Amino acid sequence: MSRVAKKPVSLPKGVELNVQPGLVSVKGPKGTLTLPKPAGVEIAIDGGVATLSANDPSQIALTGTVRAILANMVKGVSEGFERKLELVGVGYRAAMQGKDLSLALGFSHPLVFVAPEGITLSTPTQTEIVVQGADKQRVGEVAAKIRGFRPPEPYKGKGVKYAGEVIIRKEAKKA
């Protein structure tokens, strides 16, 4: 068995794991997430701990993948995930218009981004965006989509970047 799949997934208080044929659902204070269960992976729940095993030797790697996704689902419905973005550049700013995010990124028009279901967007300051949600994959996807509107450029570092991201700078051409 893979090293990842050997580790059990602990279920905190208030989190329910429900295994049905072909479907796994995790319910907690931050919402409900579902995962299609692969045929060769078995999930056993014993006293607040879920363990995974493979029926077939060819499914061992998949068992580790399912365990990692399941652990992220449990963390998501109990604590949630967040990704912070920073806007760097003169005149670059973000503002909330209801539930939509309005971005001024140097284009002739403001960009309006509609948050998908299950994702919460907020702007603590004009140059910061916080993406929050229970599904780790969707939070990262939305953050990457917002970053993709104006990725950081290597000469001045202007653009939308993740908080803490280091932009490798290039030197300007010498005359």
Curated annotation (Swiss-Prot):
Record GO terms (molecular function): rRNA binding; structural constituent of ribosome
UniProt GO cellular component terms: cytosolic large ribosomal subunit
Top-level taxon of origin: Bacteria
UniProt GO BP: cytoplasmic translation
UniProt keyword list: Ribonucleoprotein, Ribosomal protein, RNA-binding, rRNA-binding
InterPro entries hit by this protein: Ribosomal_uL6-like (IPR000702), Ribosomal_uL6-like_a/b-dom_sf (IPR036789), Ribosomal_uL6_a/b-dom (IPR020040), Ribosomal_uL6_bac-type (IPR019906), Ribosomal_uL6_CS (IPR002358)
SUPFAM superfamilies per the UniProt record, alphabetical: Ribosomal protein L6
UniProt subunit comment: Part of the 50S ribosomal subunit.
Family classification: Belongs to the universal ribosomal protein uL6 family.
Function: This protein binds to the 23S rRNA, and is important in its secondary structure. It is located near the subunit interface in the base of the L7/L12 stalk, and near the tRNA binding site of the peptidyltransferase center.
Name of this chain's protein: Large ribosomal subunit protein uL6
Naturally occurring in which organism (per UniProt): Xanthomonas axonopodis pv. citri (strain 306)
Lineage of the organism: Bacteria, Pseudomonadati, Pseudomonadota, Gammaproteobacteria, Lysobacterales
Gene designation per UniProt: rplF
